[in-house]
Amino acid sequence: MDIRAAEISAILKDQIKNFGQDAEVSEVGQVLSVGDGIARVYGLDNVQAGEMVEFENGTRGMALNLESDNVGIVIFGADREIKEGQTVKRTRAIVDTPVGKGLLGRVVDALGNPIDGKGPIQSDERKRVDVKAPGIIPRKSVHEPMATGLKAIDALIPIGRGQRELIIGDRQTGKTAVALDTILNQKPLNVAGAPESQKLYCVYVAVGQKRSTVAQFVKVLEEQGALEYSIVVAATASDPAPMQYLAPFTGCTMGEYFRDNGMHAVIIYDDLSKQAVAYRQMSLLLRRPPGREAYPGDVFYLHSRLLERSAKLNDSLGAGSLTALPVIETQANDVSAYIPTNVISITDGQIFLETDLFFQGIRPAVNVGLSVSRVGSSAQTKAMKKVAGKIKGELAQYREMAAFAQFGSDLDASTQRLLNRGARLTELLKQPQFSPLKMEEQVVVIWAGTNGYLDALPLNKVRAFEDGLLSLLRGKHVDILNAIRDSRDLSDDNAAKLKSVVDGFVKTFA
């Protein structure tokens, strides 16, 4: 037997080349059946719940149903290329997403991949999309205001940083408009050089909306200069149901990065009704037993585990916060349906938007009687508390009287006065889109309304009065606005100054 030196050296070289490299054993399974975005796979015995798997053609999926003889996998993409008998590979990673400030100004899909054509995401940190919510000890009660810039909301239904406030109403009642105005209102807080404790980053999650609608939303954010402090997560109507199910969790993880690093963020889920429908579709196709309205039994848990992740953290953890504004679409104002009642019971209050009010021209179409904030005035500045307490009572009396006044024609003077004031205050709470007001501006406008300065005006002049008063204050009396902003209070001294300015303005206004 002759020994060939070349052969030996080739074997040695081969062994040296592969030294220290253990054979990579990837656990693989076989597709048993596929259809409707669901694949049944045999052979992935050790797969984890929620683990990402990869099909032959590179399409990703998530293992949801772990059964004794097969695994039910939802597919994040088209199932057309996936055939029976193909192999499926474990990735050994639970579904995660990139997080960090590199995402600001970007539009991503439900897996965190960019879809805005601006190149790869600048982020080296990844987090799991479905994590446990903070417990009781890490939390702190909500006490800082999260201003929306809308008088009707900031005065009557105040939202605090770390709160969950539901926006609920029929289609076309201005739910997204409220959310958009809230994002635009954070622009003055997010100026370059502002302290992180003041800034409020925004995450907008679009679920099951038309692509054109999302594109329009992003365009408005860009034009108004609000995209630079915002992240948009989009799972549109043409995306598969698993993507629509996952998008809110992905957005929440991105928002949690700010919360956990001592910063503040607000996340808008627009809307959770469509996420529930996508989850119902997946559950029924996975053959899980249906419950009320054919939703699966754990649809409450779907929303509660998502919304419980919004919290105000205590000082030892950096005092960060994540505020949630989930949106729910009702059918014919029916708030007693399954998903609306679930989300109402999870959140810390709700803003009801009504079709009737919208068509009467009261926009934002907030039904002040049915809307509530369970955090309440602890999330308001002192100045706003002083002026808003009065307006709440007067509007409540007005609503009660207006119902009776329809029947009687001869009303006594005090009732007439009450109805007059109520009509003017309702007019005062109207606000056009894209024109959010700062806290101090809202305070002076509401102060003028509750102190009777509008009572003698015709209804159609209220808007002009408000604009005129604000431009006068912004121009010649900016010191009053600055004093209210800095002290967050309306001191007697400032109230006296404001009174003399408004008295003077009323005389010239005609």
Swiss-Prot record:
Catalyzed reaction equations: ATP + H2O + 4 H(+)(in) = ADP + phosphate + 5 H(+)(out)
Marked site positions, Required for activity: 371
Membrane topology: Peripheral membrane protein
Protein's UniProt keywords contain Membrane: yes
Gene Ontology CC terms: plasma membrane; proton-transporting ATP synthase complex
Entries under Pfam families matching the protein: ATP-synt_ab, ATP-synt_ab_C, ATP-synt_ab_N
Positions contributing to ATP binding: 169-176
Cellular compartment(s): Cell inner membrane
GO molecular function: ADP binding; ATP binding; proton-transporting ATP synthase activity, rotational mechanism
EC number(s) given by UniProt: 7.1.2.2
Entry keyword set: ATP synthesis, ATP-binding, Cell inner membrane, Cell membrane, CF(1), Hydrogen ion transport, Ion transport, Membrane, Nucleotide-binding, Translocase, Transport
Top-level EC class as recorded in UniProt: translocase
UniProt-listed InterPro entries: ATP_synth_asu-like_sf, ATP_synth_asu_C, ATP_synth_asu_C_sf, ATP_synth_F1_a_nt-bd_dom, ATP_synth_F1_asu, ATPase_a/bsu_AS, ATPase_F1/V1/A1_a/bsu_N, ATPase_F1/V1/A1_a/bsu_N_sf
Signal peptide: none
Gene3D superfamilies, A to Z: 2.40.30.20, ATP synthase alpha/beta chain, C-terminal domain, P-loop containing nucleotide triphosphate hydrolases
Membership in a protein family: Belongs to the ATPase alpha/beta chains family.
Free-text function comment from the UniProt entry: Produces ATP from ADP in the presence of a proton gradient across the membrane. The alpha chain is a regulatory subunit.
Assembly description: F-type ATPases have 2 components, CF(1) - the catalytic core - and CF(0) - the membrane proton channel. CF(1) has five subunits: alpha(3), beta(3), gamma(1), delta(1), epsilon(1). CF(0) has three main subunits: a(1), b(2) and c(9-12). The alpha and beta chains form an alternating ring which encloses part of the gamma chain. CF(1) is attached to CF(0) by a central stalk formed by the gamma and epsilon chains, while a peripheral stalk is formed by the delta and b chains.
PANTHER family in UniProt: ATP SYNTHASE SUBUNIT ALPHA, MITOCHONDRIAL
UniProt xrefs under NCBIfam families: atpA (TIGR00962), PRK13343.1 (NF009884)
Name of the protein: ATP synthase subunit alpha
Gene, per the UniProt record: atpA
